[in-house]
Amino acid sequence: MSHPLRHARWAFAVTAVTALLLTAAPAATAQVSGAAAAAPAPAGDVVIAAPATFTHPGVLVSRPQLDFIRGRVNAYAQPWRAAYDQMMASRYASLTRTAKPRAVVECGSYSNPNNGCTDEREDALAAYTLSLAWYITQDSRYATKAIQIMDAWSAVIQDHTNSNAPLQTAWAGSSWPRAAEIIRYTYTGWSSASITRFGNMLRNVYLPEIINGNTYSNGNWELSMMEASIGISVFLEDRTVYDRALAKFRARVPAFLYITSDGAFPKGPAGSTIDTRAEVASYWQGQNTFVDGLSQETCRDFVHTGYGLSAIAHVAETTRHQGQDLYPELQDRLRHALGLHSKYQLGEAIPSWLCGGTLTKGLGPVTEVGFNALNTRMGIAMTNTQRLTEQQRPAGTNNLFVAWETLTHANNPN
């Protein structure tokens, strides 16, 4: 059974929505419009609203991007062919995979306890992997297996519990709509009843856990929560959820990535009481010297910083597919952040003013999407990011929510 407290939180959020917001929502999506009143867009930024008509497939990867990938792989061109071969050799592409759904997924801090957490994340990644395999090969066995996995979970899952529930929900909830978008809009074998049930799962099990964000957590949490919320909103074609999540995302990014134009020190998370330099320094893991590209989690470790960087690029990519280009708004933060972390990941000496002269590296396979957007499409030189990205190719998966991005985004002009 779902936990009563979670439904109480969701019910409270629903009652908080203004009548205007409810009447503005499409009738078919009124129950989700539901999340809460939208956060204001960052001061001075242009208003960006959900598209009147959603583009499908349109979560992280678009049809033109998928067509480009298929052409490159079939031409045995590199680095795409090596990336494809890597994906197809992984356990996620197996046609004998058996999904392991459960009604309640319980995830504690640092995976203690881990009751279905790995199973859920990896089944969601497998569904996405298989959807890519389907599109590239046009072998219906891969689409059928992806559908089996998605149907297995939508028939069973009811709740996420324990302290890591929001992050777990965000990670799996980022992968599911990528898979579902590709299968729903490029394959004819997924029944309308199954599609409806899957959408209900995303709406009723996933969204309540993530849509309201998490103000005082480390930034990667809320960024991933908004990535999942935006992907889900595209699949559901829910403009109100899209707007809500995008506003919260745009407000969070400046509290995660600093640039000197922000002022003497970074912004605190929107809605928080973190606003003095001392409070910000404490929230930024004790760092008190701020330079272009520094992240709120740099001095924690590069792994969690990478989660946030990846979520930022994923959201920007999805919204671009939906007709809004966030990259001009994000480009300075993202290019400086990718460059700074790539530089030290590559081995440059760490100055004493940065995290006390000690960094915990491990950025992960998270640079391809942002690098492709800024360098390939926008022509911005990114020497260190390019070196690290090319050195790490083919980028695999972090087994959480990032997968196969050399395949999907390396030098992809679309």
PLM regions and their residue ranges:
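Amphipathic alpha-helical interface segments
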Residues: 228-232
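Hydrophobic/aromatic side-chain positions at a characteristic register within alpha-helices
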Residues: 135-138, 233-237
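Flexible internal linker/loop segments at domain or repeat junctions
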Residues: 257-298
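Short acidic, glycine/proline-enriched loop segments that cap or flank alpha-helices
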Residues: 29, 216-217, 303
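Secretory targeting and sorting signals
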Residues: 1-38
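Active-site-proximal binding-pocket segments
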Residues: 240-244, 302-313, 317-321
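Extracellular glycan-targeting catalytic surfaces
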Residues: 41-217, 223, 227, 247-253, ...
